[in-house]
């Protein structure tokens, strides 16, 4: 019998007899359960085998038998749901709990962390929001940028520890001429659906990138042989192998656009394949036919538990965005890996906005929103891991090198609109602090929570944008790629009429402009104001091995394992 149906029958019997031990007859129980005597006998045997009740049957049709209940229905439902979750049967567990997600979250708390399931190593991780899009080349947040690298592969890959580009699907490459590169492909690379990766898959994946600013200089992509791709550029780019290690350049099947569910259930050729992805959990399974070293962890379950944030303290809520918990239940065997993030919170003054076209006003606003002043308006439990920023990176000090004399905005009515991405716990507190600081200068700020896609694209006609960014280990690539490749930053920070972004992009590709100089220039225009640096935190238990915190606040799934 279906677990939910069996628990319903038990609940019906328990309610009828108020949980009391009774002498009864099989026919009476069959009438209560609305079934035949034969079926009722099977139901009682099943419940007794599970330890739910004791049934001492008496011989003869008229004999009275003794029924004793061994557990309460609420406890039974929890145990049944826990058993189903242990088997990976999420929907059935939710049905048993009458779709009570809070009850599901309570049970999951006891099952998070490392465990075994059917002789397979499983790691269950809590997360505070759903992950509906794992589509490379689209607008991806920090965690999604990490996850797509676990699911997909590219021609090249960045070794985060060394800060060097390494081979991935392409085992070798070379620069054939100043504008042409050749990449040699591994044989027998398979997609998660079992199909072999073809040279056409690679070609189509690269051609679709040309719509993005970072890849707009790709002129043609041709297959020289079934295992060799030629990429011809419009302008020189010595960083092309690094560019192709970007999460946007991960390879996709040629027919992926025909799958309406590809964003949530993508087909890749990376170490893990997506087994389930909904508002309850993301389930990843190690891909046995992966062309590299097979992942050590067999399954990764990421449970979407926004309910946990409600129950935890405000300190824990405010830092959830930069903390990955392998197990949220405290124990003496757990430890934290903590590192300063290579990135920051920032506010962007959109130079396309009518009032903010004035560099003088942007400069005055930057002065009013000095990180040292702003942080005093943010509750201590929110900012306990923060330090004030002097540039995009904690080791840079561009703002301290600026010594301009600034005034204050002219008296009068000035109203500005501030937008920030939804579903991020820290932003409302920072937005409130910005409101407070500017209100002291008689500037009214209206705050708006918008979708990440709208924020990333700079949609909505807002004057200011609050956000955060984390950079990978190759800073000379990552920072210019973000400044010049993110639609919001590119359009808001640079003068479109003078093709400023295009010119700076060309200088960077040629190696004339580096990350430090480009950052110094952007900050000198007062369109971008770094605010605070946070700390990336990874809570781990003693049984987990080789969990190394990366620049995105996560860890490489395929290298981790547990004893």
Residue map of PLM features:
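Detector for C-terminal structural segments
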Residues: 58, 364, 368-405, 425-433, ...
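N-terminal lobe/hinge region of extracytoplasmic solute-binding protein
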Residues: 125-176
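A bilobed periplasmic-binding-protein/Venus flytrap-type ligand-binding module shared by bacterial periplasmic
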Residues: 285-288, 339-364, 368, 377, ...
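Ligand/substrate-recognition segments at binding pockets and active sites
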Residues: 19-28, 33-39, 51-57, 407-469
């Amino acid at each position: 019998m279906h677990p939910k149906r069996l628990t319903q029958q038990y609940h019906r019997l328990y309610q009828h007899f108020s949980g009391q031990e009774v002498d009864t007859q099989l026919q009476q129980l069959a009438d209560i359960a609305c079934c035949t005597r034969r079926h009722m006998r099977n139901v009682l045997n099943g419940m007794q085998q599970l330890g739910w009740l004791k049934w001492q049957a008496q011989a003869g049709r008229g004999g009275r038998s003794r029924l004793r209940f061994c557990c309460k229905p609420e406890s039974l439902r929890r145990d049944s749901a826990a058993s189903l979750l242990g088997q990976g049967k999420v929907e059935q567990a939710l049905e048993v709990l009458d779709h009570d997600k809070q009850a599901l979250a309570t049970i999951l708390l006891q099952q998070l962390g490392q465990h075994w399931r059917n002789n397979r190593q499983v790691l269950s991780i809590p997360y505070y929001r759903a992950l509906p899009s794992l589509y490379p080349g689209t607008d991806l947040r920090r965690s999604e940028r990490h996850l797509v690298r676990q699911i997909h592969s590219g021609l090249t890959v960045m070794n985060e520890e060394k800060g060097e580009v390494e081979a991935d699907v392409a085992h070798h490459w070379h620069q054939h001429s100043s504008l042409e590169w050749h990449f040699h492909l591994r044989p027998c690379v398979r997609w998660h659906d079992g199909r072999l990766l073809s040279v056409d898959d690679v070609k189509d994946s690269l051609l679709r990138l040309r719509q993005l600013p970072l890849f707009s200089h790709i002129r043609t992509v041709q297959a020289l042989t079934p295992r060799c791709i030629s990429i011809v550029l419009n302008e020189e780019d010595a960083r092309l192998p690094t560019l192709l290690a970007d999460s946007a350049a991960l390879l996709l099947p040629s027919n992926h656009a025909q799958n309406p569910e590809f964003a949530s259930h993508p087909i890749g050729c990376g170490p893990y394949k997506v087994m389930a992805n909904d508002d309850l959990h993301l389930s990843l399974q190690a891909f046995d036919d992966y062309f590299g070293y097979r992942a050590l962890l067999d399954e990764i379950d990421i449970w979407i538990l926004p309910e946990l944030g409600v129950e935890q303290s405000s300190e824990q809520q405010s830092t959830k965005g930069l903390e990955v918990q392998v197990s949220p239940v405290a124990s003496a065997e757990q430890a934290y890996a903590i590192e300063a993030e290579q990135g920051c919170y920032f506010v962007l003054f959109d130079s396309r906005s009518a009032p903010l076209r004035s560099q003088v006003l942007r400069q005055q606003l930057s002065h009013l929103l000095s990180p040292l002043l702003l942080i005093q308006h943010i509750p201590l439990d929110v900012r306990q891991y923060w330090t004030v920023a002097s540039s995009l990176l904690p080791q840079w000090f561009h703002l301290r090198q600026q010594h301009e004399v600034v005034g204050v905005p002219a008296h009068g009515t000035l109203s500005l609109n501030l937008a920030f991405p939804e579903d991020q716990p820290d932003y409302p507190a920072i937005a409130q602090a910005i409101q407070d600081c500017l209100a002291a200068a008689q500037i009214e700020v209206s705050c708006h929570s918008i979708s990440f896609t709208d924020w990333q694209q700079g949609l909505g006609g807002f004057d200011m944008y609050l956000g955060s960014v984390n950079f990978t280990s190759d800073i000379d690539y990552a920072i210019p790629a973000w400044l010049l490749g993110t639609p919001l930053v590119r359009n808001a920070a640079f003068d479109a009429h003078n093709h400023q972004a295009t010119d700076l992009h060309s200088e960077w590709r040629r190696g004339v402009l580096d990350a430090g100089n480009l950052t110094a220039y952007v900050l000198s225009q007062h369109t971008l104001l770094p605010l605070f640096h946070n700390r990336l935190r990874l809570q781990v238990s003693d049984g987990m091995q080789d969990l190394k915190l990366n620049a995105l606040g996560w860890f490489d799934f395929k290298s981790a394992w547990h004893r």
